[in-house]
C-alpha cells in the first residue's frame, strides 16, 4: 500500500512565510513547499511581491494531527498581529499519496513558447515543434529554476530579435538557458560566466542535455578576453550599474548589450547608471513589474 501523508496548507501574509516555514519544518521533521514563489530562482528576497502565499507542510497522519493543527493555529494567532492583524484562514489538511508528494509539482511545468521560435520544455513533456522552432529542454527538478521567469523571457525575446550573433557572452549564466538559446539561435561562440561554481555545474548539465557547446567559466567579467556581438546580463539592477563599465567594454562595435533583472521602478536608475557607458539605448520592453533594456555600441 502506498504511504500516505497529511498535507497541511496554510495561507498567510507573504511576510510571515519564512517564519512559518521554519516553524513547520521543526514541527513536522519534514520539508515544506511554498506556492506563489517565482518558478525561476531570480527573485529579490526569494519571494515575489505578493500579498499572500501558501505554505504546505507534510506530516505522518499516524501522529496526533489534532494536536499538530492546534499548535499551528496557536502559532498563526500569536504572529498575526505583526503582519497587519487580519485573520489568517485556518489550516486545511489533505491526505495525499507519497507518489503525489514526490511528483505533483511537475504539473506546473509545461512547454512554454517565448518569442517566435524559442520553446522551453520540461524533459518529460512531449512536444511537437513547428517548423523553425528551437527547443530548449530543462529539468526543473534541478537548481536555478525553469527559465520562464519574466526576466528570462524578456532577455530571450530581445536576443531573438538580434538575428544570428557571432560571439555571445552571458554574464551570470545561472541555469545556462540564455547561453543555450544563443547557440540555438546560431551563435558561433558562447561563453557563460557565473561567480557561483554550482551555477556553472548546473549550466554544464543543461548544455549537455541540449547537446550544445558553451564555454562555462567563473572568470571575473573584467578578465574575460575579447569583445562580443551580444552581451547578456540578467542580474539585479544594482549589480548592473556597478558593472556598467565592464559590461560596456565587452560589447563589440555594432554589438548589443541586453540588460534584464530590472524592476520597472528601478529602470530609471539603470538608465542613469549607463548614461556614461558610451552605448545608445535602442529598445525597452516590459512585462509586469520587470523591464529589459537593449543598448547598442554605435562606435
UniProtKB/Swiss-Prot annotation:
InterPro entries: Ribosomal_L11_MeTrfase_PrmA, Ribosomal_PrmA_MeTrfase, SAM-dependent_MTases_sf
Record-linked SUPFAM superfamilies: S-adenosyl-L-methionine-dependent methyltransferases
Location(s), subcellular: Cytoplasm
A Pfam family matched in the record: PrmA
Residues annotated as transmembrane: none
Principal cellular location given in the protein's record: cytoplasm
Binding site for S-adenosyl-L-methionine: 152, 172, 194, 234
GO biological process, one term: methylation
Catalytic activity: L-lysyl-[protein] + 3 S-adenosyl-L-methionine = N(6),N(6),N(6)-trimethyl-L-lysyl-[protein] + 3 S-adenosyl-L-homocysteine + 3 H(+)
Keywords: Cytoplasm, Methyltransferase, S-adenosyl-L-methionine, Transferase
Any one Gene Ontology cellular component term annotated for this protein: cytoplasm
GO molecular-function term, one example from the UniProt record: protein-lysine N-methyltransferase activity
EC number: 2.1.1.-
Entry similarity comment: Belongs to the methyltransferase superfamily. PrmA family.
Cited function: Methylates ribosomal protein L11.
Protein's name according to its UniProt entry: Ribosomal protein L11 methyltransferase
Primary gene name: prmA
Amino acid at each position: 500500500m502506498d504511504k500516505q501523508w497529511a498535507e497541511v496548507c496554510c495561507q498567510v501574509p507573504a511576510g510571515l512565510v519564512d517564519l512559518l516555514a521554519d516553524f513547520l519544518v521543526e514541527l513536522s521533521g519534514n520539508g515544506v513547499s511554498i506556492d506563489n514563489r517565482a518558478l525561476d530562482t531570480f527573485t529579490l528576497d526569494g519571494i515575489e511581491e505578493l500579498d499572500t502565499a501558501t505554505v504546505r507542510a507534510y506530516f505522518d497522519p499516524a501522529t496526533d494531527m489534532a494536536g499538530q493543527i492546534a499548535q499551528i493555529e496557536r502559532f498563526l494567532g500569536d504572529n498575526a498581529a505583526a503582519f497587519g492583524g487580519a485573520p489568517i484562514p485556518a489550516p486545511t489538511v489533505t491526505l495525499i499519496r507519497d507518489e503525489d508528494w514526490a511528483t505533483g509539482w511537475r504539473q506546473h511545468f509545461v512547454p512554454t513558447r517565448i518569442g517566435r521560435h524559442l520553446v522551453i520544455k520540461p524533459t518529460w513533456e512531449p512536444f511537437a515543434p513547428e517548423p523553425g522552432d528551437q527547443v530548449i529542454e530543462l529539468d526543473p527538478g534541478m537548481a536555478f529554476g525553469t527559465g520562464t521567469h519574466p526576466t528570462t523571457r524578456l532577455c530571450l525575446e530581445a536576443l531573438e530579435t538580434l538575428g544570428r550573433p557571432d560571439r555571445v557572452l552571458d554574464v551570470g549564466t545561472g541555469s545556462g538557458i540564455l547561453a543555450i538559446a544563443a547557440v540555438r539561435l546560431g551563435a558561433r561562440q558562447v561563453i557563460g560566466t557565473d561567480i557561483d561554481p554550482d551555477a556553472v555545474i548546473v549550466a554544464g548539465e543543461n548544455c549537455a542535455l541540449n547537446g550544445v557547446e558553451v564555454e562555462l567559466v567563473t572568470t571575473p567579467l573584467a578578465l574575460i578576453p575579447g569583445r562580443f556581438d551580444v552581451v547578456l546580463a540578467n542580474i539585479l539592477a544594482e549589480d548592473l550599474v556597478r558593472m556598467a563599465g565592464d559590461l560596456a567594454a565587452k560589447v563589440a562595435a555594432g554589438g548589443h548589450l541586453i540588460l534584464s533583472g530590472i524592476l520597472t521602478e528601478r529602470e530609471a536608475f539603470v538608465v542613469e547608471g549607463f548614461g556614461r557607458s558610451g552605448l545608445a539605448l535602442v529598445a525597452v520592453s516590459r512585462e509586469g513589474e520587470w523591464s529589459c533594456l537593449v543598448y547598442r555600441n554605435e562606435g
